[in-house]
Amino acid sequence: MDSQRNLLVIALLFVSFMIWQAWEQDKNPQPQQQQTTQTTTTAAGSAADQGVPASGQGKQITVKTDVLELTINTRGGDIEQALLLTYPKELKSNEPFQLLETTPEFLYQAQSGLTGRDGPDNPANGARPLYNVDKDTFVMADGQNELAIPMTYTDAAGNTFTKTFTLKRGEYAVSVGYNVQNTSAKPLEVSTFGQLKQSINLPSHRDTGSSNFALHTFRGAAYSTPDTKYEKYKFDTIADNENLNVSAKGGWVAMLQQYFATAWVPNNDGVNNFYTANLGNGIAAIGYKSQPVLVQPGQTGTLGSTLWVGPEIQNKMAAVAPHLDLTVDYGWLWFISQPLFKLLKWIHSFLGNWGFSIIVITFIVRGIMYPLTKAQYTSMAKMRMLQPKIAAMRERLGDDKQRQSQEMMALYKAEKVNPLGGCFPLLIQMPIFLALYYMLMGSVELRHAPFALWIHDLSAQDPYYILPILMGITMFFIQKMSPTTVTDPMQQKIMTFMPVIFTVFFLWFPSGLVLYYIVSNLVTILQQQLIYRGLEKRGLHSREKKKS
C-alpha cells in the first residue's frame, strides 16, 4: 500500500466516521399534539409529576452575581431562567447566553424541593409551597464573595421550611439548602428532590447548529452512580417511555448540550433514586429523590443539594461531584481527549491564544506519532520495491489466484515485508484523529475564541473559506510528492479529486479543526522529506519524478 492508497483509506475511514456519527445522532422525536398526560416510573412519581403552577400563583425574584443571573419563582422555588453573564449568546453580542428558559416556545427549568410524607411538595396533587422572601432582587455587591437568598414557608401545623440558595463569586455551582423546623408533636419525614425538565424539540432561537454534518454534540440527559460513572440518556428514549429507575448512593443527574450543562448533585451519602420521565406535551425530565430523613419534634433538620448551571468547565465540575466533568462530550474516546485537552490548556497558559496552542499541540502530537509515520513510509517503500517481482509473478501465473496468493505471501515472508505495514500505523493514528476532533468540538474554552486576522471564533467555520482551501492545497502537495504504483484508472481519478472532496467537507468544519489539519499536513510534508532522505540512503527510494 502506498501513499496514494493511504489517502483513499483515510477518505473511507473519514466517510465511515461521518456516516456512523449521523447514525448515532440524537434525533428528537416530534411530540404528538394530543398527548397531554404525564408518564413516569413508579419511583419517579414522587417528584416528576409536579407541574408548574400558573404564573400568578407566585412571583419571580432575580438573583445576580458576577457570572449568573437567575430568575426564581417563589411558588416551589424553581429556577425558571438562567443567564450566563460572561458568555455572550453570539459572537460580538451584548446579550448573555440563556441556559434555563420558561417561555411559551421553550421550557427548561431546574426544579427542587422537599417531598415525602410531610414535605410541602405534594406529589399526589402537584401542590408546591408558596415561599416568602423579603425582597424581589438580590445582587452581589462589589467585594462580596457570597450571596444567600433565604425563602421561608410555614405549613398549617406551624412547621417552618426554609429554602436557601447560596451563590459564590465566579462560581456556577449553586447550593440549595433546606432547614426543617419541626414544631409539631410527631416526627416529620421528608426527602429532597431535584429535577431538570426540558422541551424535547428546539425552537429556532435555541438551535446552535450542533447537529449539522460537520459536528455532532450530544443533547439530552445523563446520570452517574458509583457503579455507572457516566451514562447518557437520549431524549427520544425518554419520549418512548423507556425510563430510568435506578437507586444508588451518591451520584448526580444532568441535562447536556454543546458547551453547557445543568446538573443536580444530592448532598448526602444515602441512597438516591434516579429517574427519567416523559411529562407529556413534548417535555422530558430527569431527576433524583433522596431517601427519607426523620426530623424529631422540637428539632431542626438540615438537607440540601447542589445545582450546576453553566459552562462545562472540567476542573470546576470535577470539584463539585465525581465524574461530573465527563459531561463534556468527548465521545467514546474521552480517555484520549481529556489528556489532550489538559495539554492544550497547559500550552494556552503560556501562549494566551488558543489558535497558537492548537498549532503547538499539533507539532507535539505529530512528533509523538513520528515513529509510526516512519514505519508506514518504510513499509510502503519496501512494497514498491517488490512491485516488479509481483508483476512478473502475476504474468507467470496468469489467472491462478490461489497460487498467486501463496507465492505472494511467500515473497513477503522472504523479503520480511508486512503487506499491512503501511496501513496498520494509519489505523493506530485514527483514534488520535477522532479524539482531537471531539476535543476541539466539545471544549467551551474554544467557544468564541479568536485566533488571528479574520478568524474571530475557532469554534465556528471560516467565514471566507480560506482555511479549508489552504488545507486542500496542502493535501494536494502531499499527494503530488508521494510516489505511487496505482495503475487502476478509477483509483487514479478518485485520488485526483481527493483534495477537492476533503476541501468541500471541511468548508463547514470549525476553523480550529481545519487549522489543526493544515498544520498537520505541513508537518507531514516535512516528515515525508526527512523520511525519504533516509530511505534513499538505504536504496528504498529515489527522487525520480512521480508518474502521473
Curated annotation (Swiss-Prot):
Q: Where in the cell is it found?
A: Cell inner membrane
> Could you tell me the membrane topology recorded for this protein?
Multi-pass membrane protein
Renumbered to this chain, region (Disordered) spans: 28-58
Kindly list the biological process annotations in GO that this record carries.
Answer: protein insertion into membrane; protein transport
Q: Where is the composition biased (Low complexity)?
A: 29-42
Q: Which domain of life is it from?
A: Bacteria
Q: Which GO terms describe its molecular function?
A: membrane insertase activity
Q: Does the keyword Transmembrane helix apply?
A: yes
Q: CDD domains from the entry?
A: 5TM_YidC_Alb3, EcYidC-like_peri
Subunit organization: Interacts with the Sec translocase complex via SecD. Specifically interacts with transmembrane segments of nascent integral membrane proteins during membrane integration.
Q: Hey, which family's this protein in?
A: Belongs to the OXA1/ALB3/YidC family. Type 1 subfamily.
**Annotated function:** Required for the insertion and/or proper folding and/or complex formation of integral membrane proteins into the membrane. Involved in integration of membrane proteins that insert both dependently and independently of the Sec translocase complex, as well as at least some lipoproteins. Aids folding of multispanning membrane proteins.
Which HAMAP family does the protein's record reference? YidC_type1
Protein's name in the database? Membrane protein insertase YidC
Species name: Enterobacter sp. (strain 638)
